[in-house]
């Protein structure tokens, strides 16, 4: 993490010194230097925000605002937002939601959207093909809802796959990439999914792409005499 913070700081100092020394001696060069400083400052801001958020989540200082909502409607809205964002980046997006209209979930809409956004951002970060593709599928798996987010990026090595949700873990591709992240984004995702009583895992093939899966329980009205749905077995690393 100290390296990730120091890298943009070093770049900012270098470009500021260049401006002070008169190296940026044309309007074009000055514009390029200022834009680079701005971008590097944004990188630092994002990293600090991720660190702050993870610290709050890790110490249970994030207040969750759970509400009962339509699974089809909520994930449909998420899909529409992704479609607009990815279309602007030239990424093909495919969405499928086979949930019944009356199926409901108890979620924190803001935090669960963060899960989806973090996963897709991670996909875009390592998209190495000109015809990039992202897919989102929401389906019924009994007492649970399963969300699948896939891409056709560079994929993850088999040796790295078991650890991608670990805090600060970065794959070789991430460490060697100029776009490599802090290793916090997916650990935040895991924490939020688990706070929703769910589970998350991934499959991947190098050169072909990665698919992230997470499951959350459906909302179920149970009487006092009924068996509590909290005793249901949570799907773990099983594809349906």
Task: Describe each model-derived feature in a short phrase.
Residues 156-170:
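Short conserved segment of the HATPase_c
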Residues 123-124:
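Short helix-loop "hinge" at the ATP-lid/N-box region of the Bergerat-fold HATPase_c
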Residues 197-198:
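Conserved glycine-rich
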Residues 39-44:
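Short alpha-helical segment of the dimerization/phosphotransfer core of two-component systems
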Residues 65-83:
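A conserved beta-strand-to-alpha-helix junction within the catalytic ATP-binding
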Residues 59-64, 104-107:
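Conserved micro-motifs of the catalytic ATP-binding
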Residues 230-236:
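Conserved small/polar residues in nucleotide/adenosyl-binding loops
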């Amino acid at each position: 993490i100290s390296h990730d913070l120091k890298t943009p700081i070093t770049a900012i100092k270098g470009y500021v010194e260049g401006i002070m020394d008169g190296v940026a001696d044309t309007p074009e060069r000055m514009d390029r230097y200022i834009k680079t400083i701005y971008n590097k400052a944004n990188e630092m801001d994002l990293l600090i925000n991720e660190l702050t958020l993870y610290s709050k989540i890790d110490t249970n200082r994030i207040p969750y605002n759970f509400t009962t909502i339509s699974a089809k409607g909520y994930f449909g809205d998420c899909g529409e937002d992704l479609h607009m964002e990815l279309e602007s980046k030239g990424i093909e997006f495919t969405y499928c939601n086979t949930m019944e209209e009356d199926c409901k979930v108890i979620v924190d809409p803001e935090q669960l959207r963060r899960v989806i956004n973090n996963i897709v951002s991670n996909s875009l970060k390592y998209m190495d093909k000109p015809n990039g593709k992202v897919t989102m599928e929401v389906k019924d798996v009994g007492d649970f809802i399963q969300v699948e987010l896939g891409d056709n990026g560079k994929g993850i090595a088999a040796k790295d796959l078991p650890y991608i949700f670990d805090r600060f873990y970065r794959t070789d591709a991430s460490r060697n990439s100029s776009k490599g992240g802090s290793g916090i984004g997916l650990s935040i995702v895991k924490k939020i999914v688990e706070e929703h009583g769910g589970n998350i895992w991934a499959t991947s093939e190098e050169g072909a792409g990665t698919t992230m899966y997470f499951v959350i329980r459906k909302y179920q009205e149970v009487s006092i005499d009924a068996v509590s749905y909290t005793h249901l077995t949570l799907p773990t690393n099983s594809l349906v």
